[in-house]
């Protein structure tokens, strides 16, 4: 399931992202962060991290360097 989601993110980055103005306020970008989360964590934890990140990426946020938290569960 995670591979499928990563492929969807890559498809978004190739097809839709170039058509939109740069808007992500974080480093790495929200799509890169989500792809990393789905590579590192199980489906539900990666989904939780990705949704929380996207909710924080808005005009009221200053944005900053926000790397993926380390996976301590292995």
UniProtKB/Swiss-Prot annotation:
GO terms for cellular component: plasma membrane. The keyword Membrane applies. It comes from the Bacteria. Keywords: Cell inner membrane, Cell membrane, Membrane. InterPro entries: Membr_insert_effic_factor_YidD. It holds the Pfam family YidD. It is a peripheral membrane protein. It is found in: Cell inner membrane. Could be involved in insertion of integral membrane proteins into the membrane. Belongs to the UPF0161 family. This is Putative membrane protein insertion efficiency factor.
């Amino acid at each position: 399931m995670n591979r499928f989601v990563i492929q969807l993110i890559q498809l978004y980055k190739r097809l839709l992202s170039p058509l939109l103005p740069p808007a992500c306020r974080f480093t790495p970008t929200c799509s890169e962060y989500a792809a990393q989360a789905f590579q590192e964590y199980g489906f539900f934890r990666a989904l939780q991290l990705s949704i929380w990140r996207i909710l924080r990426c808005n005009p009221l946020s200053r944005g900053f360097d926000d790397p993926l938290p380390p996976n301590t569960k292995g």
